[in-house]
Design a protein with these regions (language model features):
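C-terminal helix-to-coil terminal segments
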Residues: 1, 127-160
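Phosphate-binding beta-alpha-beta segment of Rossmann-like dinucleotide-binding domains, i.e.
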Residues: 1-9, 21
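Gly/Ala-rich phosphate-binding loop of Rossmann-like dinucleotide-binding domains
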Residues: 23, 27, 111-112
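Oxidoreductase and adenylate-handling cofactor-binding alpha/beta cores
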Residues: 27-31, 160
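Conserved acidic E/D residue at the C-terminus of a beta-strand in Rossmann-like folds
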Residues: 37
Length: 160
């Protein structure tokens, strides 16, 4: 079934330039846009940007969670089984940041046990994703080949 974004609460984890561009698009689609960042500031694209320390409580009210944060010692494995357990079972996790931010085994378990509605994954702990990964066969997972940044505008700027 389809996942309608209009009217949903979208959480951007990592509110830098990439996260803010995502927020701009979600806002245009009629979403309530929240943010979580290591260094929260005010930004008109977000209803509010929260500190990382309150991430679990913000996950519990979010319908879609998009990860756009850098990989640091603080963010490595941030989305482990414990963190994923705070998400709604109707929520979608989107990872376009770094694969190691998400514990793939914990995510696979959450998806197979229907603790999450689905996931969109552009990055993985180890790339390319192993051919024997169960993620390939899950109907509630969309996998892209680490190219979420690709667009006609980017392409024309890189290859004039």
């Amino acid at each position: 079934s389809f996942f309608e974004l209009c009217g949903k609460t979208v959480l951007t984890v990592g509110c830098g330039s990439v996260g803010s561009e995502c927020a701009r698009r979600y806002k245009a689609l009629g979403c309530r846009v929240l943010g979580v960042d290591l260094y929260p500031t005010e930004n008109e694209l977000y209803e509010k940007i929260y500190p990382l320390s309150v991430l679990p409580s913000i996950l519990s009210v979010s319908d879609a969670v998009i990860l756009t944060l850098p990989l640091t010692d603080e963010t490595r494995g941030l989305f482990d089984g414990e963190m994923l357990s705070h998400m709604k079972n109707t929520a979608v996790l989107i990872n376009i940041s770094r694969g190691a931010v998400v514990d793939e085994d914990a995510l696979t378990a959450a998806l197979s046990e229907k603790k999450l509605y689905g996931a969109v994954l552009d990055v993985f702990e180890s790339e390319p994703l192993s051919q024997d990964s169960p993620l390939w066969d899950m109907e509630n997972v969309v996998i892209t080949p680490h190219n979420s940044f690709v667009s006609e505008k980017i392409r024309s700027g890189c290859f004039p």
